[in-house]
Amino acid sequence: MTLVYIEGGIFLWITMISFLSLCSIWVMTLLNLFTLLLMSPIIFLFLSLPDRKKGYLHHYFQHLQDSSELLNVKYVCMDMYLPYKQISKHYFKKALICVDSFHLIKHLNESLQKVRIRVLRSYDTDSIQYYLLKKWKCLLFDRTIELDNKGKFNKRLGRYVNYRQLLELILAIHPDLKSAYELKEKYTIFNATSSYEEAKQNFDVIYHDFINAHIPEYCDFITSLSNWRDEIINSFIVYRGKRINSSVAESMNAIVSTLLFNTKGIRNIERRRKRIIYAVNKTGFLIK
């Protein structure tokens, strides 16, 4: 293990890298946008870059492009940020690029939310439909809710209903909402249960289901499915017993956010960045 210093960022460099995760934390300062970039091999490689724009990333990785370590990277996991994809293809020539499924599911839920809001706005605020879409929207998104619970008396509806009955009432409000919800559920189950081989076989079927639904709020999500098809399928590959994702990196973001809050009194941006990186690297992190 070697301690390397490059352009104000101190980080740990591991010679046998097999997995790389790209994510970032943005903090607005008086002088610039402060970005933290996390790389995670067997032991975390943590560094700080002042920008995540494509030009700067090219400038940074040019320092390393002749290094054999870049060829040891097998997988690169990222959110759907195009410059990350372009940089990874250029510098990690032997690596498979994977999209973190968390970001894709988040995008999908945001699209369904837009459908809900569009339908909601077509009803008066004192209507039953508005009440259901506003009060019980959680039933569309939270898959941890036990739908077949014991029914309770609902004053607004004037009868006993359980969560499943409420969901059925919501989905009956508009065909677009019902179709959008069913597509969301179908993709969520596909994402949670498919193997890599099953993902390769079934992805295009689900993709065309979204297209054939003709739901305008899903247009951006469909574009993401199209532009990131191979990277989404690659995310179903199992690495060290788990699907490839950046969940560990995202949890690290919470730690760094706390450190950022605790170092508000340090006005020198460079010193603040170095202290945060030192604090994170001092304890060390392992992917279990």
Model-derived regions: residue spans:
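Acidic/histidine-rich catalytic cores and adjacent linkers
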Residues: 30-42, 50, 60-98, 102-106, ...
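Compositionally biased amphipathic helical and low-complexity segments enriched in hydrophobic
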Residues: 2-4, 13, 21-23, 72, ...
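Two-metal-ion RNase H-like nuclease active-site motif
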Residues: 5-29, 36
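Short, basic alpha-helical nucleic acid-contact segments in DNA-binding proteins
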Residues: 1-13, 115, 279-283
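Short alpha-helix plus adjacent loop in nuclease-associated cores
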Residues: 104-125
